[in-house]
Amino acid sequence: MANTPQAKKRIRRNDRRAEINGNRVNRIRTFIKKVESAIAAGNKSEAETALASAQPELFRGVSKGVLHKNTASRKFSRLAKGVAALA
């Protein structure tokens, strides 16, 4: 248990940041699911628009520190590959 005032403040701050970061990751997952569901449905135009809206969310996660840049690039690359495979 935290004894010093600074340690107590850090616990409060960590809890706030964990909630914010969790919401960010959840938002990114939602955008990814939209693209994946459009790909599964075979709807190319919907998949393209969903991918275009998912890209900035993925890389915003990188700049905010909730995703590694290679992870975001890999996820985006795989989604783009799935969209490109739709004919």
Curated annotation (Swiss-Prot):
Superkingdom of origin: Bacteria
Keyword terms of this UniProt record: Ribonucleoprotein, Ribosomal protein, RNA-binding, rRNA-binding
Family annotation (SUPFAM superfamilies): Ribosomal protein S20
One of the record's GO cellular component terms: small ribosomal subunit
HAMAP family associated with the record: Ribosomal_bS20
Family of this protein: Belongs to the bacterial ribosomal protein bS20 family.
Any one of the GO BP annotations: translation
Organism per entry: Zymomonas mobilis subsp. mobilis (strain ATCC 31821 / ZM4 / CP4)
Name used for this protein in its record: Small ribosomal subunit protein bS20
GO molecular function: small ribosomal subunit rRNA binding; structural constituent of ribosome
Pfam families: Ribosomal_S20p
Role of this protein: Binds directly to 16S ribosomal RNA.
